[in-house]
Amino acid sequence: MNRRLFLLTGLAAPLAGCATPSRVADLDALRKQVTDTEIAFAKTMANRDHAAFVGFVAEEAVFLNSGKPLRGRDAIAAHWKRFYAEAAAPFSWKPDLVEVLPSGTLAQSVGPVMNPSGVIVARFNSIWRLEGPGVWRIVFDDGYKVCDCDSKQAS
């Protein structure tokens, strides 16, 4: 029995080392998928396409909404419709950091939110879930205002 265990361990060890680099490559590909998805999600605002926005939101998603959570796709869609009402987008966003769990099933994206003049006014934090091959949907979202600390200290 010990000999069999020794043989199995001896065979498995080199294979474990081989599996790691391909997993890293998979995570890189998944990071790119999530980055591309976040960029496409943000384009819905620029393109004024509320229906496309809703398509990125998971059925059971929760948007934290400054401590007043919006629960479910329908509630989120109804609340966000106002941001798509005018001809010009009231804000834009883009990811500057994306990370994926080793399982490849959840990801986090964070980045700046800009006003129409391009000034950073907030940062967002989104959690994405892999719902099918190459299909990521947002399950949690939050944002927070950023401090313009330099100008406040200058006054």
Report each predicted region and the residues it spans.
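A beta-strand edge to alpha-helix "cap/lid" segment located at domain peripheries
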Residues: 6-8, 18-55, 62-155
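N-terminal secretory signal peptides and thylakoid transit peptides that target proteins
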Residues: 1-12
